[in-house]
Amino acid sequence: MLLYIILGLLILVGDQLLKGWIVANVSYGALHTVIPNILGLTYVQNDGAAWSMLAGQQWFFYIVTIIAVGVIGYLFYTSERSEKLYRIGLTLMLAGALGNFIDRLHLKYVVDMFQLEFINFPIFNVADTALTCGVICVFIAILLKEKVTHD
């Protein structure tokens, strides 16, 4: 259990520290190339979801996040200790959801900063990455579990 708590806290604290650094050191809207033609930093304030969908609908995001945190907590609590990949995925999802929730509560928007320069993709942050990786881990864990039960 301690591993999951440490992992979640590292992601959550890292997300918040990086967001604070971005706000203090990167000009709003300006692209700063990190890896040419691959990755840049662009500070944006996102009051919606990816591609600014549902912009300004903060109460929607509050409600969805509270429900998601409850469901993730329940799934973690009821999972088997041996389901490590599944639990890691849930931990990543929880840390990501809480990282963006903190922004929404404190700032009324989410600080995003990573911009992929080689594709038209929404600017995102550490919390978004944790959420995405968590969903992938949970999906793989479920597929692997189904494969074992069918064999």
Swiss-Prot record:
UniProt keyword annotation of Cell membrane present: yes
Residues that span the membrane, as ranges: 3-23, 59-79, 85-107, 123-143
EC number: 3.4.23.36
Enzyme class: hydrolase
Pfam families found in the cross-reference section: Peptidase_A8 (PF01252)
GO terms for biological process, alphabetical: proteolysis
Biological pathway: Protein modification; lipoprotein biosynthesis (signal peptide cleavage)
Keyword Protein biosynthesis: no
Substrates-to-products reaction catalysed: Release of signal peptides from bacterial membrane prolipoproteins. Hydrolyzes -Xaa-Yaa-Zaa-|-(S,diacylglyceryl)Cys-, in which Xaa is hydrophobic (preferably Leu), and Yaa (Ala or Ser) and Zaa (Gly or Ala) have small, neutral side chains
Membrane-related topology note: Multi-pass membrane protein
Localization of this protein: Cell membrane
Span of the signal peptide: none
GO cellular component: plasma membrane
Main location per the UniProt record: membrane
UniProtKB keywords: Aspartyl protease, Cell membrane, Hydrolase, Membrane, Protease, Transmembrane, Transmembrane helix
Single GO MF annotation: aspartic-type endopeptidase activity
UniProt-annotated catalytic positions: D112, D128
Family indicated by similarity: Belongs to the peptidase A8 family.
Role played: This protein specifically catalyzes the removal of signal peptides from prolipoproteins.
Name assigned to this protein: Lipoprotein signal peptidase
The organism of origin for this protein: Latilactobacillus sakei subsp. sakei (strain 23K)
Encoding gene (name): lspA
